[in-house]
């Protein structure tokens, strides 16, 4: 038989730092009609308001209901233009390229197909907009933080940007330089219980990086193409 959970939704979220909602509007991926359930929407709002993180990609919480397309528009700080808000003043287009999330972006962010007709609400930090369509934004909601990204096709650069978005939304920026490579083409994998860590060059070219371990310790490293180096902790 199907097992159901007796815990209230809010308690299911207690162990989480960040929720990620990815996909197109009205799909199983983003939730669809489930957003009409006030217990679900209020639990997630409460989670973020009390200090949790929320990252939405594509059309997160997308379901036309009660005058909104994004049911978490006030959490994310962005909304999708649906024709009903054409007469609203939309003036929040100033970009903030120095934001923590973008500090490793050494080239224009690739959003893939992205999404069109996304605009920022008042008080939202627009990180990237193209032709007055928001592609990435950051927003404080209560004690919590939300990030909107229009699309995240896989690449080493995008992995780094998403990682920074997760840390920022979790108020964990100070954890960035822990088992970390300054060069996003290189990864650090720590196996703390086994007392080992490795540094991996993910490319077919030599790479130079600064490796950060713990306590702010770091060292410079050169890696040949596809090289993996192992170290004791």
Predicted region positions:
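Extracellular ligand-binding/catalytic regions of CAZymes and related secreted enzymes
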Residues: 11-12, 23, 71-86, 120-125, ...
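Short, small-residue-biased leader/transition segments that mark boundaries at the very start
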Residues: 1-7
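Short catalytic/ligand-binding loop motif for oxyanion handling, primarily in non-cytosolic enzymes
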Residues: 28-29, 62-67, 137, 156-158
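A glycine-rich, often tryptophan-bearing local segment used as a flexible ligand/cofactor-contacting loop or short
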Residues: 31-107, 112-114, 127-128
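Loop/turn elements at helix/coil->beta-strand transitions in domains of secreted/extracellular proteins
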Residues: 14-18, 50-54, 144
């Amino acid at each position: 038989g199907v097992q159901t959970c007796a815990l209230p939704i809010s308690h299911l979220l207690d162990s989480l730092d960040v929720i990620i909602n990815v996909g197109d509007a009205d799909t199983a991926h983003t939730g669809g009609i489930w957003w009409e359930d006030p217990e679900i929407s209020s639990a997630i709002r409460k989670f973020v308001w009390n200090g949790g993180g929320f990252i939405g990609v594509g059309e997160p919480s997308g379901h036309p209901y009660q005058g909104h397309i994004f049911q978490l528009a006030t959490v994310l700080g962005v909304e999708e233009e649906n024709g009903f808000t054409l007469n609203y003043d939309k003036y929040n287009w100033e970009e903030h390229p120095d934001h923590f999330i973008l500090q490793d972006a050494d080239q224009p962010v690739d959003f893939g197909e992205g999404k069109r007709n996304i605009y920022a609400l008042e008080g939202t930090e627009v990180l990237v907009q193209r032709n007055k369509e928001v592609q990435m934004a950051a927003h404080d909601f209560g004690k919590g933080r939300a990030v909107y990204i229009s699309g995240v096709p896989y690449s080493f650069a995008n992995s780094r940007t998403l990682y920074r978005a997760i840390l920022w939304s979790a108020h964990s920026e100070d954890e960035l330089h822990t088992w970390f490579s300054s060069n996003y083409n290189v990864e650090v994998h720590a196996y703390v219980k086994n007392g080992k860590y490795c540094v991996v060059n993910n490319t077919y070219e030599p790479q130079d990086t600064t490796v950060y371990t713990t306590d702010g310790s770091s060292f410079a490293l050169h890696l040949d193409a596809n090289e993996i180096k192992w170290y004791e902790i």
